[in-house]
Design a protein with these regions (language model features):
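Substrate-binding cleft and catalytic face of glycoside hydrolase catalytic domains
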Residues: 1-164, 168-174
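Short, glycine/acidic-rich beta->alpha junctions
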Residues: 20-24, 117-118, 182-186, 224-229
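Conserved, mostly hydrophobic/aromatic
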Residues: 77, 93, 167, 236, ...
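Active-site flanking residues adjacent to catalytic metal/cofactor-binding acidic residues
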Residues: 97, 204, 338
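Glycoside hydrolase catalytic-domain groove-lining segments
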Residues: 162-215
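Aromatic/acidic polysaccharide-binding cleft in carbohydrate-active enzymes
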Residues: 203, 207-299, 312-320
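Carbohydrate-binding surface patches
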Residues: 316-350
Length: 350
């Protein structure tokens, strides 16, 4: 329920900060704090039939009916987590996940202008409450670039240059058959659009294109998938991306009442063994959080690249063989190559 009828005034006594959902969030933030991770806090949208959704409907999350109420609640959350709970790991926020399809008004996809209005309202509220400098705004968060268009990002970079600290996009269209040049071209367009606004571009989600609905990928248990993920990441970084985020770290349920079919089985490692009791993979699992083969390839990338590193692209004569050189802030170099072909490749570095 709403705290009051005045979005300009936060009634802290009406907020529930000890709910099961908040306790779950605290556990994740505690781990991030302990492991010195940097967190981007994303709100998916206004839940259907929630007071923030108002009359908007059409999916399990929709656009907020009132930007002012939405901004008040988002501000209250950030104030509580950073000022009261003292979480220093929260560095960035993304106000809505993939708004190009999820930002629904009256059951229909809203225009980009509606999303832009919300972001500007959020920026004003954070400034009013004195917390704007505490977190960066990662905006656009679009999925439409992944289906061959950059229109959503283009509109956001035009209209939110003075609001965003970074722009980000998601993609799941690249696979074993995708040449390096295609991946490079996709991200270069994102990079140039963001650069025109004076901001970096981050790939906030990426994975392969062997999708089975939103919760499965056919090649998830193959080592070769890890090599593909590295090849995609190399090309994204070579094209100018400020960073990449594989989706997702671990198998997970989005909702506690979801069916087994709804479990997101996209992780670098699995969830607890009992969660797979009805699956054919159950008998072969020996431990909780079993690591998938793709982890061993992808972690060769993530274990050696640190935030703030410089990227120096390495050209190769093969469209399915990618390389890059990374100079970390401590001056140490890392050379990364991903061979997506069936033939061995010789590497000579001089």
């Amino acid at each position: 329920e709403n705290d009051n009828d005045d979005p300009g005034l936060i009634n802290w006594d009406k907020f529930t900060f000890n709910s099961p959902e908040m306790q779950s969030l605290y556990r994740e933030l505690d781990l991030a704090q302990q492991q010195q991770m940097e967190v981007t806090l994303t709100l998916w949208g206004a839940p259907d039939k929630h007071f923030l959704a108002g009359r908007n409907s059409g999916n399990w999350v929709v656009a907020p009916e009132s930007n002012e109420e939405w901004s008040e609640n988002f501000s209250a959350l950030i104030q509580y987590l950073i000022k009261e709970k003292k979480y220093t790991c929260i560095k960035e926020i993304t106000p809505v996940n993939e708004p190009d399809w999820s930002f629904l008004v009256n059951g229909k996809r809203a225009s980009t202008a509606k999303y832009i209005e919300m972001c500007k309202a959020l920026d004003r509220r954070f400034k009013k409450d004195g917390i704007r400098e505490l977190v960066d705004f990662s905006l656009s968060d679009n999925s439409d670039g992944g289906i061959g268009t950059h229109k959503y990002l283009a509109a956001c970079t035009r209209e939110l240059a003075d609001v965003a600290d970074v722009f980000n996009s998601h993609t799941y269209i690249f696979g074993y058959e995708t040449p390096n040049s295609t991946i490079l071209d996709w991200e270069r367009q994102n990079y140039e659009l963001s650069k025109s606004a004076g901001k970096p571009h981050f790939v906030g989600e990426f994975g392969g294109n062997q999708c089975v609905g939103a919760a499965r990928q056919k090649d998830i248990n193959l080592y070769e998938r890890g090599v593909l993920m590295v090849r995609i990441a190399i090309n994204l970084l070579n094209a100018g991306a400020s960073g990449v985020s594989y989706w997702s770290l671990i198998d997970q349920y989005y909702g506690k009442n979801d069916s087994y079919e709804g479990m997101q089985q996209l992780g670098l490692w699995k969830y607890v063994k009992n969660a797979y009791a009805q699956d054919t993979c159950y008998e072969n699992m020996t431990v909780d959080y079993e690591v998938r083969p793709q982890y061993f390839a992808y972690s060769l990338l993530t274990r050696f690249i640190r935030p703030g590193a410089e990227v120096y692209p390495i050209s190769t004569p093969d469209e399915f063989y990618a390389g890059t050189a990374i100079k970390n802030k401590d001056g140490k170099w890392v050379y990364i190559f991903a061979n997506g072909t069936a033939q061995e490749k010789k590497i000579k570095i001089s």
